Amino acid sequence: KPVSVIDDGTVSEETRLGAIGDIQFAIDKKGIDSDMVVIAGDNLFTFSLKKYYEFFKAIQTDCVCVKPFGDMEMLKQFGVAEIDENGVLIDVEEKPQEPKSNLAVYATYMYRRETIPLFKTYIAEGNKPDAPGYFVEWLCKRKQMHAFMFEEECYDIGTPQSLEHVSKIFEAKRM
């Protein structure tokens, strides 16, 4: 399907909708009533979206991408997932002070059609509209979700410093 850019009209920090508010804005603006993929624009990854999508279709639940992460201090900057032996999410906590596992959740989500109305519910209940991980934290307490485990690379390039760091990593690989 073609990709389209949707402008929410925000011109300042004070009027921004937040990531979850922007997702709801896109749902309303485009009349989305189907399964949906949400990928943060500041993610750079090398895993296969096709494999992830095939997993999503086979498992028939909402899914998140997770990867084991070695640096427990850095893990505090991510969503952290706890899963059972079948890959079912038991809990997700966004940016925990004390991570309960070493599984980082990356902002690449696949949602089933029946989940789409829950974005509006989440916002109406007054929940945090910022990071999309807060929605996952809320959602996994209401319905079954699965974790897609990957081992390839995934980086957050949302700051000039992290973009420069990742650029150096990829430049070194080309040599």
Descriptions of predicted regions:
Residues 1-83:
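Conserved beta-loop-beta/alpha segment of the NTase-like Rossmann-fold superfamily
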